[in-house]
């Protein structure tokens, strides 16, 4: 069964039910199924290789992704924000059989192309009946940041997501009565997953051409959103907008957060502005999909990313691959039916394999109750004064300080210590903490060798397209484009 396994059934049973809304356009299930079928017929006849989709965020991209999946072809979803040189390098590696682009490609679409006239724009004729694709065929290549600077293309088979759909039904109970708001870019796997998950369930999926808190709030109100997918920065901006307007979203029953740890100081505002929503955050990776889930009702220990997601088995291993007991820190390995197939852009040094278990280099430990605690990424580890330090631990503590909105701790070359710690900070509005105060704050919570002595304020906090802190961009600000705290 493919990720579009239930689309035709929903179209038959509930033809007039809304399936997809984006940018002022809404498709019913009958209309979506018919359009996907026509576009799938076009893609099935394309030259061998993947279907490259280099398009702005929107309904056209969503439909063409589903069409490639139904055709048994691999949708390679590029980020339209990439520089031209990076785009060219990625295309040279993934070599699509057909490229659909708003720039240059085999099929060129206008940047504003919607669903009206989409089939004609790609040269699709009438739909032809076709068998369901093999569940072990690849359907998707997404891209995530690579240690070399070139995005890594990871490949997934249908089965990895259909198994996820079934597992998260058990976790979250998403069904045909839900209205799913996924206001981020489809080049980010979280929001692409939300789209596919919603269509599989027969829900109404709300997308946005770009993330704007006001537009997200308006979509939620106008269509009665019940489920919100987001990364912490987006959810926080949405909450700030609701607070500024004196509004709430009482119709939301579930907020699903991923990409980074949700700040504890924001929980009260979330409960006030989304008063009927259960909050759950999950840890995962592009290669791993769901790994753990942390639900408010399950009394997750402070600092933990939760318990294993349904269908997932966790282990902690040392550098030699030996399994470690509870409480011991090592590399986090995951076994599940949700794992990716391989890298479409070649070998990655960040991937570790032990039997049927895979690790992307995250370090952590399991407590006696089976909750996972992440320490950091092995590739971000800093050696200072001969000791290994994971900067994520320091960042998490700094972000509990009321004056700090975001923190990034990096190592700067130091002839005596190996690397000197520098804490880069985005300060909360109107706040101006002194360096000595921050040192004292950290010394009461961390060992002395983990306490930075240098603090730099960053006026315009760099973010990746997916809303995460852009650490390489922050490193480039040192020392001339940041302001040292006195």
Region annotations inferred by a language model:
Residues 447-468:
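AMP-binding/adenylate-forming catalytic domain of the ANL superfamily
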């Amino acid at each position: 069964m493919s990720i579009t396994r239930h689309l035709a059934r929903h179209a038959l049973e509930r033809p007039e039910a809304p399936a997809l809304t984006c940018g002022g356009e809404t498709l019913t299930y009958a209309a979506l199924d018919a359009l996907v079928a026509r576009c799938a017929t076009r893609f099935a006849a394309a030259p061998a290789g993947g279907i490259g989709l280099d398009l702005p965020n929107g309904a056209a991209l969503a439909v063409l992704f589903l069409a490639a999946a139904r055709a048994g072809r691999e949708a390679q979803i590029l980020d339209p924000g990439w520089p031209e040189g990076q785009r060219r390098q990625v295309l040279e590696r993934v070599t699509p059989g057909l490229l659909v682009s708003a720039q240059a490609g085999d099929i060129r679409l206008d940047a504003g192309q919607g669903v009206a006239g989409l089939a004609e724009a790609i040269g699709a004729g009438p739909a032809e009946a076709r068998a369901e694709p093999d569940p072990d065929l690849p359907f998707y290549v997404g891209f995530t940041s690579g240690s070399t600077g070139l995005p890594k293309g990871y490949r997934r088979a249908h089965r990895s997501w259909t198994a996820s759909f079934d597992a998260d039904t058990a976790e979250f109970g998403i069904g045909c009565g839900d209205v799913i708001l996924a206001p981020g870019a489809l080049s980010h796997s979280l929001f692409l997953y939300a789209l596919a998950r919603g269509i599989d369930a027969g829900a109404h999926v709300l997308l946005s051409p770009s993330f704007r808190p006001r537009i997200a709030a308006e979509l939620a109100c106008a269509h009665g959103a019940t489920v919100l997918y987001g990364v912490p920065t987006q959810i926080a901006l949405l909450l700030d907008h609701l607070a500024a307007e004196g509004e709430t979203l009482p119709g939301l029953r579930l907020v699903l957060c991923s990409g980074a740890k949700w700040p504890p100081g924001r929980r009260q505002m979330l409960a006030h502005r989304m008063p009927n929503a259960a909050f759950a955050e999950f840890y995962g990776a592009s290669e791993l999909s769901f790994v753990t889930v942390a639900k408010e009702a399950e009394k997750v220990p402070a600092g933990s990313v939760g318990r294993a997601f349904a269908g997932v088995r966790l282990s902690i291993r040392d550098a030699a691959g030996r399994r470690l007991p509870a409480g011991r820190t090592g590399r986090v390995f995951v076994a599940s039916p949700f794992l990716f197939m391989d890298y479409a852009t070649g070998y990655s040094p960040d991937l570790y394999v032990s039997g049927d278990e895979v690790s992307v280099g995250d370090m952590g430990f399991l407590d006696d109750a089976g909750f996972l605690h992440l320490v950091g990424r092995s590739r971000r580890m800093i050696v200072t004064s001969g000791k290994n330090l994971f900067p994520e631990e320091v960042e998490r503590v700094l972000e509990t300080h009321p004056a700090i909105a975001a923190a990034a701790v990096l190592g700067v070359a130091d002839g005596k210590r190996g690397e000197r710690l520098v804490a880069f900070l985005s300060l909360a509005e109107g706040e101006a903490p002194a360096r000595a105060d921050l040192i004292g704050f950290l010394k009461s919570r961390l060992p002395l060798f983990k306490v930075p002595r240098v603090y730099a304020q960053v006026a315009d906090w760099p973010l990746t397209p997916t809303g995460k802190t852009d650490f390489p961009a922050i490193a480039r600000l040192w020392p001339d484009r940041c302001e040292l705290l006195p």
